[in-house]
């Protein structure tokens, strides 16, 4: 293990001991915000220090076995112990490297998931609906909460655009690699000749701002229009201008919300989505220079980049960033994304480790 890494782990061990002391004091809950901060830090450091303790134990085991080598009767036993200890140290060191990787500050945030139909007309809109169902089924498996923020339905079903808020532990860290172009190849229900059509949708995963105030938005930069919500009519036809369109003039970002009958609620939702879009734009601009110097295969989140193909006739899904093909499309479309997401996270960790190695 590198000296710099060992020094870092020693510092974390010392810090954990300090946290244990602070959390054992009688007045620790006097300041609840500080208490939550300390318990969160303790929860993050605990597993790292525990792994480091196991690594140090393996190192001690190796040192003890080295001393036995001088005894001919113990040589075979000692060599087995040394080999076992070194294998354990190598495995633990790899785990510790991953644990020490820079943490994405957005990983613990809730998200806004935006799906837009692209090329392919009605078929693209139908596929947008299929993608939404896929993510909602995945969210259901994770016991995450889902809230519809905005939807623009197409005539034949599906969506021209849909935005949902997903709240739950790990929402952003698990879904952040879904941003990009999603292509589908299949025979549309309206196709009489049995020809395979290709269409596409774009997905954007945006971390939710803790508070709207976290993103600086000058009210003078906003144009807010109200209009009558579109609907199928009938007894629930919306007779008031409850739908809201918010335009952020400096960036040209436009958000519409019309799902609620309350204009106030629609405006509140639109401002939350707008804050997330501005934050997302700032994040990508900030990382553009880094991306230019070190091409990341999966971390760019560029919506124009085609990241995945869903081929229904062959029952396969291919993620082009990591050259992964899975022949279990039906399960994937039903929200079984663990294998795919796990592979993307592993590749991202490998990229981070490689970049840290270059920095060293």
Swiss-Prot record:
Modification after translation, per record: Methylated by PrmC. Methylation increases the termination efficiency of RF1.
Keyword Protein biosynthesis included in the entry's annotation: yes
GO cellular component, one term: cytoplasm
Subcellular location: Cytoplasm
Keyword Transmembrane (UniProt): no
Modification sites for N5-methylglutamine: 235
Residues making up the signal peptide according to the UniProt record: none
Keyword terms, alphabetized: Cytoplasm, Methylation, Protein biosynthesis
One matching Pfam family: RF-1
Domain of life: Bacteria
SUPFAM superfamilies reported for this sequence: Release factor
GO molecular function: translation release factor activity, codon specific
Family statement drawn from the similarity comment of this UniProt entry: Belongs to the prokaryotic/mitochondrial release factor family.
Described function: Peptide chain release factor 1 directs the termination of translation in response to the peptide chain termination codons UAG and UAA.
UniProt-recorded name of the protein: Peptide chain release factor 1
């Amino acid at each position: 293990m590198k000296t710099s890494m060992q020094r870092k782990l020693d510092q974390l061990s010392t810090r954990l001991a300090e946290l244990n002391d602070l959390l054992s004091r009688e007045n620790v809950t006097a300041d609840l915000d500080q208490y939550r901060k300390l318990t969160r830090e303790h929860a993050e450091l605990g597993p790292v220090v525990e792994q480091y303790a196991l690594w140090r134990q393996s190192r001690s085991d190796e040192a003890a076995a080295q001393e036995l080598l001088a005894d001919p009767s113990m040589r075979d036993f000692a060599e087995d112990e040394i080999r076992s200890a070194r294998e354990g140290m190598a495995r633990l060191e790899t785990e510790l490297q991953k644990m020490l990787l820079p943490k994405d500050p957005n990983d613990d945030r809730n998200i806004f998931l935006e799906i837009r139909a692209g090329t392919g007309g009605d078929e693209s809109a139908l596929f947008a609906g299929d993608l939404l169902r896929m993510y909602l089924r995945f969210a259901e498996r994770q016991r995450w909460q889902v809230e519809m923020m905005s939807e623009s339905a197409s005539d034949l079903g599906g969506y021209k655009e849909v935005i949902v808020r997903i709240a739950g532990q790990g929402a952003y860290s698990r879904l952040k690699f879904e941003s990009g172009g999603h292509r589908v190849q299949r025979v549309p229900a309206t196709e009489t000749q049995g020809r395979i059509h290709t269409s596409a949708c774009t997905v954007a995963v945006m971390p939710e701002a803790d508070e709207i105030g976290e993103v600086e938005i000058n009210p003078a930069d906003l144009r807010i229009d109200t209009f009558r919500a579109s609907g199928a009519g009938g007894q629930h036809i919306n007779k008031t201008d409850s739908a809201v369109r918010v335009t952020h003039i400096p960036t040209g970002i436009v958000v519409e919300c019309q799902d609620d009958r309350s204009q106030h609620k629609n405006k509140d939702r639109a401002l939350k989505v707008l804050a997330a879009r501005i934050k997302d734009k700032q994040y990508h601009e900030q990382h553009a220079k880094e991306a230019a110097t070190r091409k990341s295969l999966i971390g760019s989140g560029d919506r124009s980049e085609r990241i995945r193909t869903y081929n229904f006739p062959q029952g396969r899904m291919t993620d082009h960033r990591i050259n992964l093909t899975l022949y279990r499309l039906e399960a994937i479309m039903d929200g079984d994304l663990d294998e795919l997401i796990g592979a993307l996270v592993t590749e991202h960790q490998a990229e981070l480790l490689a970049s840290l190695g270059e920095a060293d």
